[in-house]
C-alpha cells in the first residue's frame, strides 16, 4: 500500500446553483483557447494575421471534436453509453480519440488556410506546440473523470481511484499510474522543445509538425503499455499501440524528408 498518493476528485461536475459544469468539457474549452492563443502568437510573429487563425480555429476545432469523437466511437463502440445513438455525442462523459481529432481538424484547418492563400506548411509548424499545449491541458479532464489511468503502483505519485471506477480485476488495488500526469509533463516538455528548436535552428516546415507527430506518438508507445482501460486488440496488443508505432516512424521519416528538400518559400 502506498503511503502517499495523488488524490482524485470524487465527481466530474461542479454545481453552481441550477447550472452544472462538466469539468471535462470546461477543460476542453481551456485547452482549445490555449492552443489558439499560442498559435496566434507564433503566427503573428511570422508576419501572419489573427484573422486567419480565428477562421482556421472555428472550422478546425469543430472538425477536430467530430474527428476525435468519431475515432473513439469507432475504436471503442462497446464502451459508448446506452442508448448508443445518444452516447455517440456524449463528449462530456469523456471519450475523445486524439488522433482522429488531429487528423480531421488539421485537414479542415489546412483547407481553410489554403483557401485564404496562407502557407499551409508554415501554419502547421506554428500550430504544433499549441496542439501539444492543448493536449496537455486536456488530460486534466481524464483526472476529473477518473479514467485512462495505468496499472496499479505503490509509487508515491500513484493516483488514488475510487472503488466504483476501478476495473473488476483491479478492485483490490487503490493507487494506479497517473498516465494523465505523465502525458501532461511529456506534452508540455515537447512543446517547449519545439518552440526552442524553431527559434534556434533553421527547421524547414513542416519539420516541427513532423517532430510533433513523432514525439507524441513515441510517448503513446510507452503509455499504451501502461494503460489498463478496455481497448481493441490486434495480434494480442492494443490497437492504439500499433497506431503509435506507425505514426512515430511516419513522423521521423517525414521530418528527415522535409529537411533534405529545398526550403519552402510560399
Regions found by a protein language model. Give the residues of each.
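A feature for loop-to-transmembrane-helix boundaries and adjacent hydrophobic helices
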Residues: 1-266
Amino acid at each position: 500500500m502506498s503511503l502517499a498518493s495523488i488524490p482524485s476528485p470524487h465527481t466530474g461536475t461542479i454545481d453552481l446553483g441550477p447550472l452544472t459544469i462538466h469539468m471535462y468539457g470546461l477543460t476542453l474549452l481551456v485547452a482549445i483557447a490555449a492552443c489558439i492563443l499560442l498559435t496566434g502568437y507564433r503566427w503573428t510573429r511570422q508576419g501572419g494575421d489573427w484573422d486567419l487563425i480565428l477562421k482556421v480555429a472555428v472550422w478546425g476545432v469543430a472538425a477536430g471534436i467530430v474527428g476525435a469523437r468519431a475515432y473513439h466511437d469507432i475504436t471503442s463502440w462497446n464502451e459508448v453509453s446506452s442508448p448508443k445513438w445518444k452516447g455517440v455525442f456524449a463528449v462530456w462523459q469523456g471519450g475523445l480519440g486524439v488522433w482522429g481529432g488531429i487528423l480531421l481538424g488539421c485537414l479542415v484547418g489546412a483547407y481553410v488556410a489554403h483557401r485564404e492563400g496562407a502557407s499551409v506548411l508554415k501554419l502547421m509548424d506554428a500550430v504544433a506546440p499549441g496542439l501539444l499545449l492543448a493536449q496537455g491541458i486536456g488530460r486534466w479532464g481524464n483526472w476529473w473523470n477518473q479514467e485512462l489511468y495505468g496499472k496499479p503502483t505503490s509509487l508515491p505519485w500513484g493516483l488514488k481511484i475510487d472503488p466504483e471506477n476501478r476495473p473488476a480485476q483491479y478492485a483490490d488495488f487503490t493507487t494506479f499510474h497517473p498516465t494523465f500526469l505523465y502525458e501532461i509533463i511529456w506534452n508540455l516538455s515537447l512543446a517547449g522543445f519545439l518552440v526552442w528548436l524553431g527559434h534556434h535552428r533553421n527547421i524547414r516546415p513542416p519539420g516541427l509538425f513532423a517532430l510533433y507527430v513523432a514525439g507524441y506518438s513515441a510517448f503513446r508507445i510507452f503509455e499504451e503499455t501502461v494503460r489498463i482501460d478496455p481497448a481493441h486488440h490486434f495480434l494480442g496488443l492494443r490497437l492504439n499501440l500499433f497506431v503509435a508505432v506507425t505514426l512515430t516512424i511516419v513522423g521521423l521519416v517525414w521530418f528527415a524528408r522535409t529537411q533534405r528538400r529545398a526550403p519552402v518559400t510560399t
